[in-house]
Regions:
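Conserved ATP-binding subdomain of kinase catalytic cores across diverse folds
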Residues: 74-212, 245, 269-286, 292-302, ...
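Outer-membrane beta-barrel "beta-signal"
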Residues: 678, 820-822, 840-851
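Outer-membrane beta-barrel initiation region
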Residues: 441, 451-453, 464, 470-577, ...
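Transmembrane beta-strands of outer-membrane beta-barrel pores
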Residues: 527-533, 543-545, 561-565, 586-594, ...
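Outer-envelope beta-barrel architecture signal
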Residues: 519-523, 533-537, 551-557, 578-584, ...
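C-terminal outer-membrane beta-barrel translocator/porin domains of Gram-negative envelope proteins
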Residues: 515-517, 566-568, 597-599, 609-615, ...
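A subset of solvent-exposed loop/turn segments in beta-rich extracellular surface proteins, enriched
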Residues: 535, 545-622, 638, 642-659
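C-terminal catalytic region of ATP-dependent kinase domains
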Residues: 145-151, 257-427, 432-439, 445, ...
Length: 851
């Protein structure tokens, strides 16, 4: 059976390596008395950071030694801190507690060590729960993975920010004794008997001019008189790049407004600088970060390998907030930081760390930050160039006028005006060499779009209209695309030379700052094992582009290779509304690709005494299959497909195929086919008792292009049904039939059965029918020290047969068996099964994301 190893399967494999390569000896530090004003305490006990050489090579050393090194800090309780504080709420985004004192001043308390964006990946958001994973090796592994973060250098980062004229939050470290609080942090971790950091937080009650990021973005759309202080924001972001702080999520910012002339400028306030100076090492650990989609977490080095990649989490917000600034602002702020953060200031920043941790790692960081400082202007230029590749611009909810000037052969100019006042509120130049595409959102209001000029190599511009009564004046040219509501057709009918897309789909017209042009690449292992085919391993490479049109992506390419099956390709190109899709599938088989062949009919010999190779036929196969998919709903789809196929069976001297066909038979020559097909699939949830009822109907016609007389129509139908008997007991069944309407087909095109106790293609003919049924019992959870594990058992029964002209057979073939399934880390399901038949037994192993 086929299996595709998801990120979850990597985790299973990697955690096993963690278990067997780590030193798991447990120990506990002596309890520290609550009455001590100063205590010596480490973040982790020494046993938790004591690892073998093999573990360090595979998973890295990180900053692990710092986590078990005791430091001297004051001991506080919630009653003594700030004269007494109370818990306001859990700060889920920071895995901490928001505290308030009697003067209504706020601070954020969070344990040192713990968890980070590592567990905020899509995979861990779906599967990880601190309480469920408690006392498992995976939980210990995640805690160890956090040691890529230096636990103390946030103090130095805060000092560097203050020295650069940026916001700082007065970071401090304390010890919180046992029994000082019953609260936990957001992930369920106990907060007592730990080292904690305490930082000041802006007071929203007494400072109403402080906004959250989402509130800021809404405010900016109201009027261009509301602006971000781009100089300070760009300086903040360049400081992030200097210290390698990659965790700039929207929740990490607050915005303080101040009046300046007719405008309100919002200055950035940073909440957390804990993720600077990351140390990422270990062969398997680096690979795991890529698998989890966290490849932007990289080792802090003197020269960033990809400044765009390392700023993945902050890129969309940078695009939204810095559109008015050109490269001179970026390089100017980089120069300011370079001149301000002298060697003495950097040395002083790291001298503020707790005594006793001035080890080689701190010296390494100090050296690297000085080297990176000298390259900061180059880093700024490279990052600005990334922002300019596909800039996203917005108007306001007022009536705006957009002027796009394309007369210059080297540059494109965009200006924005407030129609009510005539004031120019935006003026930027874009290089044709560096800018590949521009998206311009009109937002609300009655906007006017003006485009003039025409040159040979024009930058594509997407004009996305809002709901107002918009007008257009455009000179002849190319590469202008207008997205307008259906109600705007009449206005655009008089506008020539542009591509027009009319749609009332809200997602097309609404501005979302997270919607930026980007792509993702991933590798997925691919494998097969059963007792018929044996092992075959390979991998898939997936390239997904997210452009303006996405449902949920713009297009996707998947290229895979498998040792037995060869190369496979799939391209998916969805429409704007996601209801239609154009797909391309292709296959180029390897020389090891084979079909089983036992002859035609329902009573063929199984050749149980012969080796498996005796009935295997090596076939070179090529297939190119474009298809059109039309979705009527999420569970109803119509597919129109056309395929061009090539087959050629290999001649051998000692196999069944050569006894069945003569040497000069057409089967051993290159055969070309065309296949036209239409299929319809539907699936419904009838009720809670019947959660799934689905069916597929397919009809088509195949023709041999070298012998047009050999053509045949065909039809297929299948039905699936799941019945939930109890919460843990389910009956599932699937029945399928195939019909060929004449005898002009080859053996690899024949109707066949899929009985789990027989080899593939064991019975083939002109017609076929088979059904399998399973009764599945969910056995619940299985306690173990590795990871949460759910398991169940199932028993199955299959029956089926084929019909072949001239054969009189009333025999129905059956197979029976069962197996067990295991669901690891709440995500990945492995299934082991063994089914028997009159031929023999067949063992199968499956690995996937469901039963």
């Amino acid at each position: 059976m086929k299996m595709r190893l998801s990120p979850a399967s990597y985790i299973v494999f990697l955690v096993m390596l963690f278990v067997f390569s780590a030193d798991m000896t447990a120990s506990v530090l002596p309890r520290v008395g609550e009455g001590d004003s100063l205590v010596r305490k480490s973040i982790y006990p020494p046993s938790a950071t004591r690892k073998s050489d093999l573990y360090n090579k595979l998973w890295g050393e990180h900053y692990r030694t710092l986590y078990s090194l005791p430091i001297t800090v004051p001991a506080v309780t919630l009653q003594s801190l700030w004269g007494g504080v109370k818990v306001v709420e859990q700060a889920a985004d920071f895995q901490g507690l928001l505290l308030e004192n009697n003067q209504q001043q706020l601070c954020l308390l969070k344990p040192l060590g713990g968890y980070t964006t590592f567990i905020e990946s899509k995979f861990f958001q779906e599967v990880y729960n601190k309480k469920v994973f408690k006392n498992t090796y995976l939980d210990q592994f995640i805690g160890d993975a956090y040691t890529i973060i230096n636990p103390y250098t946030f103090i130095s980062a805060d000092y560097l920010a203050r020295s650069s004229g940026l916001s700082s939050n007065n970071s401090r470290i304390f010890y919180l004794p046992e029994h000082s609080t019953r609260d936990t942090v957001a992930n369920g971790t106990s907060i007592e008997n730990k080292l904690v950091s305490v930082i000041d937080v802006p007071d929203f009650n007494t400072r109403p001019n402080i906004l959250l990021t989402e509130e800021l973005l809404d405010t900016l759309q109201a009027n261009k008189n509301f602006q971000v202080d781009q100089v300070l924001y760009i300086r903040e972001r360049l400081l992030d790049m200097l210290i390698g702080d990659w965790n700039k999520i929207p929740e990490n910012w607050n915005w303080l407004g101040r009046s300046e002339g007719d405008s309100i400028l919002y200055a950035p306030i940073v909440i957390d600088r804990n993720h600077a100076f990351t140390k990422v090492d270990g062969v398997l650990f680096k690979q795991m970060l890529r698998v989890l989609g966290l490849g932007f977490i990289v080792n802090y080095d003197a020269s960033p390998k990809s400044v765009r990649k390392e700023n993945t989490l902050g890129f969309a917000l940078d695009m939204a907030l810095t559109s008015q600034s050109d490269v001179s602002v970026w390089t100017g702020q980089a120069r300011f930081i370079r001149q301000t953060l002298t060697d003495s200031i950097i040395d002083k920043a790291f001298s503020r760390l707790p005594k006793g941790i001035e080890d080689k790692e701190i010296k390494r960081i100090t050296r690297i930050i000085k080297e990176r400082r000298e390259k900061l202007e180059v880093i700024a230029k490279n990052y600005f160039a990334s922002l300019q590749q596909t800039p996203v611009l917005t108007g306001t909810n007022r009536s705006d006028r957009f002027v796009i000037d394309r007369h210059n052969p080297d540059s494109l100019f965009i200006q924005m005006y407030d129609q009510q006042t005539g004031q120019r509120v935006f003026d930027r130049k874009y290089s044709r060499k560096k800018t590949k595409e521009i998206w311009l959102y009109g937002l609300e209001g009655d906007d006017r779009f003006e485009v003039s000029g025409r040159v040979n190599k024009e930058v594509p511009v997407f004009l996305i209209a809002g709901k107002g009564k918009n007008t257009y004046r455009m000179e002849p040219g190319h590469h202008i695309r207008v997205y307008e509501y259906e109600s705007g057709k009449a206005v655009l009918d008089t506008v020539p030379h542009v591509k027009k897309v009319f749609s009332d789909i809200p997602e097309i017209h609404q501005y979302d700052y997270n919607k930026i042009k980007h792509h993702k690449m991933s590798f997925t292992p691919w494998g097969i094992y059963d007792s018929d085919k044996g092992f075959s391993l390979g991998t898939f490479f997936t390239y997904t582009m997210y452009g303006f049109k996405r449902s949920p992506f713009t297009y996707q390419h998947r290229i895979g290779y498998n040792y037995i099956q060869g190369f496979v390709y799939q391209g998916i190109f969805p429409s704007y509304d996601g209801k239609k899709s154009f797909n391309i599938d292709a296959t180029i088989s390897s020389r090891r690709n084979f079909y089983n062949f036992f002859g035609f009919g329902n009573n063929t010999d199984g050749y149980k005494d012969a080796k498996k190779n005796y009935n295997r036929v090596h076939i070179r196969q090529f297939k190119l299959s474009p298809s059109f998919h039309l979705d009527f709903s999420e569970k109803e789809r119509l597919v129109l497909q056309a395929s061009w196929e090539m087959f050629k069976a290999k001649e051998t001297n000692d196999r069944f195929i050569n006894q069945f066909y003569p040497e000069d038979h057409r089967i051993f020559k290159t055969n070309l086919f065309i296949d036209l097909g239409l299929s319809f699939h539907t699936e419904k949830e009838i009720c809670s008792f019947i959660p799934k009822l689905g069916g597929t109907l397919t009809g088509g016609w195949k023709m041999n292009l070298k012998d047009a007389s050999r053509n045949f129509p065909y039809a297929e139908a299948s039905v699936e049904l799941d019945v939930k008997i109890t919460d843990r007991l389910t009956w599932a069944t699937m029945a399928k039939t195939q019909q060929l309407f004449n005898n002009k087909y080859e053996f690899y095109q024949a109707a066949s059965t899929e009985l789990r106790g027989y080899r593939d293609n064991r019975f083939i003919g002109k017609q076929s029918f088979y059904q399998y049924s399973d009764i599945r019992l969910d056995m619940g959870k299985l306690k173990n020290p590795f990871t949460p594990l759910k398991y169940g058992v199932f028993a199955g029964f299959d029956y089926g047969r084929v019909w072949f002209p001239g054969e009189q057979s009333k025999r129905w073939h059956t197979s029976y068996g069962g197996g067990i399934w295991l669901t690891l880390i709440n995500k990945i399901t492995t299934k082991y099964s063994c089914f028997g038949s009159t031929d023999s037994f067949r063992f199968m192993f499956e690995l996937g994301l469901g039963f």
